């Protein structure tokens, strides 16, 4: 059994242990950085030194280390998270691997993301749900292109807490001057991200030797800060959750019998209390919250991150994909917006092609009208392009076939983030973060040579024959 869990069970008993564990705060973090910076080894070290590995897992790692390990006689702790056969054979991470562990203070979900450039899309997927980014830097190599790329994507995805871990300090003889040099280089780069709200901590460690990961290290006696695990335990993410206006995307209409009709979902931002007046969008109908229902009983209020079922005083038409907000909300409804897009498939993004677009619980249809620029992740310079390639990131104009209530991504990730789905293959091909909402009062000039019938026929063809890749004629008018 996991030795840490076994000890707590012996001290508390099963019921007290489960109760204590249930109410611990949850932190989601990812490890990212360039190839061979030691991301998987760091996670393995965290699990090992915090006594979160079961005996049979450790035995399996010892056995596998003799066959495919890279650490000589010692167990290769990276094998705890590199589970795919290709990953073990090549000694790299390909897919996003998730691991779970807890300490006395907090529960953790770790996303171990790949460092290779061709798997950048996997890194973006892992980062999309995280609160903290642990960015690894090889002390021998310093800040690399992929370090900058992952930092840019993490910032783009709204992660506000960066922990920069300068790894492999044992290979530079635990040099303080080398650490300070890398620290200065990274802080200079971080200023280009133009985010004054970024919380950046920088610390030295050696994942292979276990220096400054869970426990302080004598070899790093010149470093006066906390080891990595303590930094993770003390990151304050509660302030981030409670900010913003109330947003509640409806995921499911719960009607177990004729006497109950509730709307299930997770509070995306802000908070709600019994008696608050809400508006259902897009219908605009108002009501008041009658109950906030959970498995453990009713609540008087709910905050961001809580999964609840809301019942209302009035019977109004609400379905999956609708959005509940407070009546005084100034949420904007639009069918056009600008978004930063990360493209995730071999076939490049081309303006004019239609895709299914999923925002929160709602699915609609849209297209890219124009690509303003692509970002050079290494230099953060912007350049013109006609097509967004695999792993490309760019600012684009997006239009939908219907009006949808949206937020900017920085205000609410759930109602400001979306994915592109290929209409033929159902493959997720891209992800977007809304930056600016367009003013619907801006209208395009009408071309009298195009009849209403032709516009309707064009819309019909685009809806039922997407493989023809017909452009939206209404966007070409004028």
From Swiss-Prot:
Residues 206-208 are annotated as: G5. Its EC number is 2.7.7.4. Residues 112-115 are annotated as: G3. Residues 167-170 are annotated as: G4. One of its GO terms (biological process) is hydrogen sulfide biosynthetic process. GTP binds at residues 33-40, 112-116, 167-170. Pathway: Sulfur metabolism; hydrogen sulfide biosynthesis; sulfite from sulfate: step 1/3. Residues 91-95 are annotated as: G2. Heterodimer composed of CysD, the smaller subunit, and CysN. Belongs to the TRAFAC class translation factor GTPase superfamily. Classic translation factor GTPase family. CysN/NodQ subfamily. This is Sulfate adenylyltransferase subunit 1. It comes from Aliivibrio fischeri (strain MJ11). The gene is cysN.
